Regions:
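Inter-blade linker and blade-boundary elements of WD-repeat/beta-propeller domains
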Residues: 1-9, 39-59, 92-104, 131-148, ...
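Residue-level detector of Asp-centered blade-edge/turn motifs that repeat once per structural unit
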Residues: 17-18, 69-70, 110-111, 160-161, ...
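Conserved strand-to-loop turn within each blade of WD40 beta-propeller repeats
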Residues: 25-28, 77-80, 118-121, 168-171, ...
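Structured C-terminal portions of repeat-based eukaryotic scaffold domains
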Residues: 186-198, 205-208, 214-245, 250-252, ...
Length: 317
């Protein structure tokens, strides 16, 4: 299916959770446009723009847009210090001033509870987007911050359950955090691991965290470096993947693949480090398993991961 962006073009695209609609950021219009799936007379389907675009609210270039997996709200972020939370009909629910001098990245957590941003300051700020039992929006409140970097933060990412976060900074380090904390009781996230990534000192970086939080991918320029977060060690390095700088990096929802975007192309990589991480985890759990049923279940997972590595020619003896 194709959708025409009349008298403009899109710079960012995000699908709704059910994939029956998507939003785009208009390059010339400087606002959001919604496209919904509609049925044609011949029985096929197409995407049609809604009658009205969202109102213009941002005063600086946009850096990211996102739709919550619950479908309850949309986030837009600009390069000044502004994050906007919208309902699906184009009404601003909340305006967030990040106080980070400028934003470099912003995102919604996979659980849809949080929005977060990073920028010129050496931290990542996270807010909770609160809804009532009936699904009505209530407020946006501060949740927690990731503190410890000594320079601006380029990018961050959540694990699929939002219990882990990773960040990469201009100080030349990446960090893995335990964010499964009682933030309403003022409990701060725990630092689990720190690793060196010197390229971050001189170049803008993109970061992706696997759904289970066990693999971290970092992109700078046209190269990708992949780390095991349990050990903090680099496992893979893909040089000159694209002819131009990589603009985005993401794991698929299963964690089996890593995708990179650049020079008008998307490239897919098998997540062999992810399978190795599962092998390490299952071997450790097997040593501590106390009953046979648990051992059988763990052995099955171990075997599947080993078979996946063997099929990729990546099984280390």
């Amino acid at each position: 299916m194709r959708a025409n962006v009349e008298l403009d073009h899109a710079t960012l695209v995000r699908f709704s959770p059910d994939c029956r609609a998507f939003i785009v950021w208009l390059a010339n219009g400087d606002t959001l446009r919604v496209f919904k799936m509609t049925k044609r007379e011949d029985g096929g389907y197409t995407f049609t723009a809604t009658p009205e675009d969202f109102p213009k609210k941002h005063k600086a270039p946009i850096i990211n847009i996102a739709i919550a997996d619950t479908g309850k709200f949309i986030m837009t972020a600009s390069s000044d210090t502004t994050l906007l939370i919208w309902n699906l009909r184009g009404r601003v629910l909340s305006t967030i001033n990040t106080n980070q001098m400028n934003n470099t990245y912003a995102a919604i957590s996979p659980c849809s509870r949080f929005v977060a941003s990073c920028g010129f300051t050496p931290d990542v700020k996270v807010w909770e987007v609160c809804f009532g039992k009936k699904g009505d929006f209530q407020e946006v409140t501060r949740a927690f911050e990731l503190k410890g970097h000594s320079a601006a933060v380029h990018c961050f990412a959540f694990s699929n359950d939002s219990r882990r976060m990773a960040s990469v900074s201009k100080d030349g380090t990446w960090r893995l955090w335990d964010t499964d904390v009682e933030y309403k009781q003022q409990q701060d996230p725990y630092l689990l691991r720190t690793g060196r990534y010197e390229e971050a000192s001189t170049m803008l970086c993109r970061l992706a965290l696997s759904p289970d939080g066990q693999v971290l991918a970092l992109a700078s320029g046209s190269s990708i470096h992949v780390y095991n977060t349990r050990r903090g060690e680099k496992e893979e390095c893909f040089e000159q993947v694209h002819g131009q700088c990589i603009t985005d990096l993401s794991f698929d929802i299963t964690g089996r693949y890593l995708a990179s975007c650049g020079d008008r192309a998307v490239r897919l990589f098998h997540n062999a480090p992810g399978h190795r991480a599962v092998v390490e985890e299952m071997q450790g759990l097997l040593k501590r398993a106390s009953n046979e049923s648990t051992r059988q279940r763990l052995q099955q997972q171990l075997t599947r991961a080993q078979e996946a590595l063997k099929s990729l020619g990546a099984l280390k003896q």
